[in-house]
Amino acid sequence: MRFNSEPFDVIVCGAGHAGIEASLAAARVGAFTLLLTGNLDTVGQMSCNPAIGGQAKGQIVREIDALGGEMAINTDVTGIQFRLLNHTKGPAVQSPRAQCDKKAYQFRLKHTLELQPHLQLFQATVTGLIFDGAKVIGCRTNLDIEFYGRTVVVTTGTFLRGLMHIGSNKNEGGRLGDFSARTLSGSLQEAGIELRRFKTGTPPRLLGRSLDFSKMEEQKGDANPTFFAFHDTREDGGVFHVEHGKPQGEAIPPGCEQVSCWMTYTTARTAELVRENLSRSAMYGGEIEGVGPRYCPSIEDKFVRFADKPRHLLFLEPEGRGTDEFYVNGLSTSLPFDVQLELVHSIPGLGEAVLLRPAYAVEYDYAPPTQLKMSLESQRVEGLFLAGQINGTSGYEEAAGQGLIAGVNAARKGRGEQPLVLGRHEAYIGVLIDDLVTKGTEEPYRMFTSRAEHRLLLNHGSAELRLLHHASGCKLLNVNRLDNIARKKEAIESWVRRLESERTSEGTLAEIIRRQNARAELPSELMRQSKPVRDEVLYRVLYSGYWEREQRHIDKLAQIEAVRIPAAIDYLRIPGLRRESALKLAAQRPDTLGQASRISGVNPADVSILMVLIKTGKTPSLPDTATTDGRDVP
């Protein structure tokens, strides 16, 4: 049965963090959008830890907000603890993080989706895609209903042939309590998309009243919280009643009545239990084939890979105001349940803990992201976009950032418009996508500030300034907000010029600020500016030398970054190009010389050969009239 007589502009398959941002972004730029999910009651569920942000991830969330996404606002409104990480270090590596009320976060997102114009929700499990040659035109569902669309965004998370492990026990599913998407993998493979297996895991959940917090160290939120959204949600009554368990009208404004997290450590007994039972672990017992995340290791990995460490830090994180459930951050495991009980009880403060949910590992299919264009469209299937964990990433924030870009580009593809592509110097989202597409990943990819070579320019406070032209060009923000950002940008640049030019007997005001490390007395007019303006002005003045050096480096890189490679180039017929490089370039088909230079195995000499051929117009062409990635031949 066909659901719609006229095709949707965009169909999004999956309503996790990538799917939500994809569907909202597409709808907000005016595309008639359908969001399909197997269960409308789990839209936006925080499957693992109840937190948003953290190192580099906080910057991604602010970039999502700067581009009109929802994650930042949703976090501010449903957050129950806010902290600025690395606050004693420079602004380039400072990152906001928040604990969220898990259910409130989910419910508010669903409510936002329901109210969004141009967006329709429907509960059905996607079982396969519908193709017309090398182009996707819709999808099939378990209800025997077919949905047709101009573009399709697949955001399946851990559900593609998801298999959960607790010791030797196995159950199909992408998350405890939910089924897996079993047949969609076959549909993708039939279209020529390669799939591999990754693994992730989650720790047990505990009953709060069974914990002894007197044996743990308290971790409070910041007295002056750093929020994620640039627009202060408190100004327009940004409250959401569901999470608070109070009568309507008594909801808690963002940042107020914050809750605490708690810290404890593993013991020698914990280590002994892990080592004694390694063979019963699904991971170490050979039950799991997929590669797990390096930067979020299981407790088994911690005691094997870091055997010299006598103990490991654990965080007890509350899952909400209206629940007594706690998440044990750092205790992910695939050990059997009887061992899990002993592990938990070996930890200070958890000796009498009651387990509400077991820890488990989940194995799932992902598509190596080198099969994508920078727009996140498949090279093989026209109109098919992939975002989130299907691209090999881990984390809500990485998924949401990809989802927003995929949603915008799916809408733009349907209109015949150029895609939105963020540069590495413009956004962490740009670094993320460029890394995935040009380098690929052999393990679940997590973003860090160290991955961004231009991180000095990517501080969390500047996101809406550096992405203003993209937000404006894509019509992702309303006119009032765009005007406000433009005025803020002008004010910052004006104040930087003034401080660099106004002189006193001790030098310019900027020189005095740099000499006194921001302790200098600032002009009263500047002090009357908003804190975000003051902070950005001081940051640019204090680090002006580094800032200018970065800009010069970016300008130099732009000389090759902007050079487009002909779509029909035949790398295997280029004289002097090493065969290893030719094969990798032919497989990934980068759009620009800059992308080509970042592909593993391609060296500067290879790039120089390409540069000369492109500039002289002597690049050999493929014999066919179209490239293998579906791009039209110029």
Curated annotation (Swiss-Prot):
Pfam families: GIDA (PF01134), SAM_GIDA_C (PF13932). FAD binds at residues 14-19. It comes from the Bacteria. Keywords: Cytoplasm, FAD, Flavoprotein, NAD, tRNA processing. GO terms for molecular function: flavin adenine dinucleotide binding. Its cofactor is FAD. The keyword DNA damage does not apply. GO terms for cellular component: cytosol. It is found in: Cytoplasm. Homodimer. Heterotetramer of two MnmE and two MnmG subunits. Belongs to the MnmG family. NAD-binding protein involved in the addition of a carboxymethylaminomethyl (cmnm) group at the wobble position (U34) of certain tRNAs, forming tRNA-cmnm(5)s(2)U34. HAMAP family: MnmG_GidA. This is tRNA uridine 5-carboxymethylaminomethyl modification enzyme MnmG.
